[in-house]
């Protein structure tokens, strides 16, 4: 078993202990004090694990590499440690004062709220933003925003912000694997909801419209619990094994089993039809009546039934709850000599019958309560005559019953023909619905014509046209249309509300989305910080080279042009370096282009459309270097002059574009193969590469010729690479240059290095004055 497997085992055991401790908070403290030895043993184990593992996990997550399990286990151990101490202190206080209300308020932390936090995000000395975070949805959304501004956030500040988010998640989630209802908002979507919708056709709808009203099942994962019958069987087995067979308990269990097994009234002829159809298969002769019976049975099962039949009513739910409470009190009296008074019994007397439906019961499965609420909501539509489709099932059942009677009755030839005619008439009746009313209306209209009416005189065509009958037909068709549209809308509304109720009522376990995203962001900042802390073997090129070396590379690039056909590929490289570490679909088995990752990042962060347009315009690029060379000398990613976050982002994008396009032009002009890499991605150690760290104090690292160079200026590193970078000697302390004696031989004296160009002559290197590459106009010295 390796270290990761051991860590998973420890996490599993800690989860088991956390679930038991969370349930213990809701139990009667008097009963807990009767046998508190197991709690004491578990508490000592938790304290030992916390002191042994938590500091090492915190150091690993902050300095080396974070993962989903290490982040979750660190949070869980810290919360477990705090909760076992809290419960132990609360039990000691309860033993002195005996107040259950006070005990529950203490262990459940009802007197204070620690689920709200205000985080300060510092980008530069001028730009500081505050963000209020109170739910898991807001944590996930803030991580998406951090991913979008990943390059302009210093790694030390980013890691500090991530640590505060992990602490807040510990306060939101606690030790329970079941997420608290106040810790999340069920109708706010996450990044996985976005990715799932992006993988299917949009049918002409925007992503925001498709996300609106969608229930998220990723931040918290809904789990359906067992039904009542399974719970009773398990309960009976546990009671027999614990206390044996007792008459009072056995009678209560029998009442519970009889209550839960009472089913709703169903159509007996459906079962009879299934028994009849069971005698036929692929190799038997199938009479027409059997085929019709199978057809109607199929439609009776697959057609939508508005009024659902459930196996429990409100009265049964209340009776079931009362019997379970009596059974619990009997067990408490037998085992501990006193009735059980846990948190759920304190305000139970104030609930009425219908209120029990909305509050629920700890003894009933949430799925059963959801079915009951849906059934009660739908029954209000049963008596509405507009919804004609409500009665179609009864017509289908009547056809099934008539077919069964015909099968049981011996039929002669005429009877067979009559049955076939009845079957055909039944099929027509099912299709026509309530056509009899229209026929009656037509007969009444004909009688009115015979008796004399307003259309008996005049145009013969008008007399031949039965207006009254047409009115009835059109009215029937209109009502049928309204019925179908209304029925579909009602069913759509009810299904949507049922999904929402199931999400609210059922158990929702804590998902892994926030931990996965947090681990990716932390690892990115850790790798960027590693370049800040790296000192050994790194030579600062800014101390070796001068401004004219910078100008030499710039002048050789500024008059060249990039091939126009290379712009799309360079745009993809631009998106690669602008994006954060969260969306990495370019590394999937079936990789997506970098612009898809960037689109996911922008949409999930909520970037405004005009900023997206600016980003795309920069990505499209131009072939002229004069339009993208914008970074000052030795100030790459030094954006302290920006006044707001939008200006800061645009400046960052411009610097990234300059790096991508200038390195591509450098490779094109000098025939090099220098590769650009991110600081937070795996690299090929054998290849020459230029690593972009985004850090102000060392944004660029050059790996070439066995040596490592860093600089705040791109073109100094390109000059170092152009000169044939070799392993540098150990850097020596710079010595002051010797004083030159005054002489009149000005031609033999070297020009001092200049920090900014004054005249065109200053752009020329002294070693190249006699070179044919330099125009004569630059060599003229008046």
UniProtKB/Swiss-Prot annotation:
One of its GO terms (biological process) is viral DNA genome packaging. GO terms for molecular function: ATP binding; zinc ion binding. Disulfide bonds: none annotated. A zinc finger (C3H1-type) spans 190-218. InterPro entries: UL28/UL56. ATP binds at residues 666-673. Keywords: ATP-binding, Host nucleus, Late protein, Metal-binding, Nucleotide-binding, Viral genome packaging, Viral release from host cell, Zinc, Zinc-finger. It holds the Pfam family PRTP. GO terms for cellular component: host cell nucleus. Belongs to the herpesviridae TRM1 protein family. This is Tripartite terminase subunit 1. The lineage of its organism: Viruses, Duplodnaviria, Heunggongvirae, Peploviricota, Herviviricetes. The gene is TRM1.
